Amino acid sequence: MSIKKVLLGLLTLAVTVGLSVGTTLYVLSRPELLTRHFYAGEMAAVVSPATLKKYIDEKATNYVLVDLRSQGEYEKEHFKTAVNIPAGSMSEAQLVAMFAKLPKDKEIIVHCYSAYCTLGRQVGQALSRHGIYVKELTVGWSELRYHWDLWNPGAGVDDGQDYIVTGKADPSNAPIIPCTVGEFGC
C-alpha cells in the first residue's frame, strides 16, 4: 500500500471524526438544541395520567399497561387493564423474556410505586439494551391511587375508584413467572 493511500485514508478518518465531534460540540453549545433534544426524548418515553385515563375510558386496545410492583401489591389493587410483571423480583434476563412476550404492535406503558421510584426507568433502560422500548407513566401507583383527581384535571368528583380493581392477573394477559430477588428495585 502506498503512502499516498494511507495518508488519504487517515485524512478521511480525521474528517469523519472531526465532523462527528464538531456536530456534537455544536449541539452541546446551543441551549435551544439541547432543550429540543431533551423534550423530544422525554415525550418519546412517557405517558401522562390523562392519556392513561383516556385509554381506559375508551377501552383502547392499542396499549398494554404493565404494573411493575410485586405480585402481592398487584393482587391487592391495580389499575384496570394492567398486567403484572413484578420487575423487582426479576433478573434482567427474566425481565427481557417477559416483555418479549408482549404484543409488538402495542404501546407498552410501565408504572411502579411512585413518581420517585426509579424502577420504571431502570426497566426501560434495561429493555432498551435489548431492543425493547417502553414508555413510563409520569406518575406512579401512589399518586394516581390516592390523588386521581389531581393528576386528571377536569375529571370532576371522580376519585379513581372506577379505574381500580383487585385480584390476580387475567392469565390471558401476560404470564407471571416465579422468580428470585434480582437486580431491579426502587
Kindly give the residue locations of the regions a language model identified.
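Flexible, polar/low-complexity N-terminal or interdomain linker segments that lie immediately upstream
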Residues: 2-64, 68-73, 153-186
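Sec/Tat-exported extracytoplasmic proteins
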Residues: 56, 60, 78, 106, ...
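Catalytic cysteine-centered active loop of the rhodanese-like fold, especially the PTP/DSP P-loop
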Residues: 96-145
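Mid-length scaffold segments of soluble, non-membrane domains
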Residues: 71-88, 101-103, 107-110
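Conserved beta-strand scaffold positions in the cores of enzyme catalytic domains, especially
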Residues: 46, 65, 82-84, 134-136
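Short beta->alpha connector loops
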Residues: 88-91, 115-116
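Short low-complexity, flexible loop/linker segments enriched in glycine and/or proline
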Residues: 99, 149-153
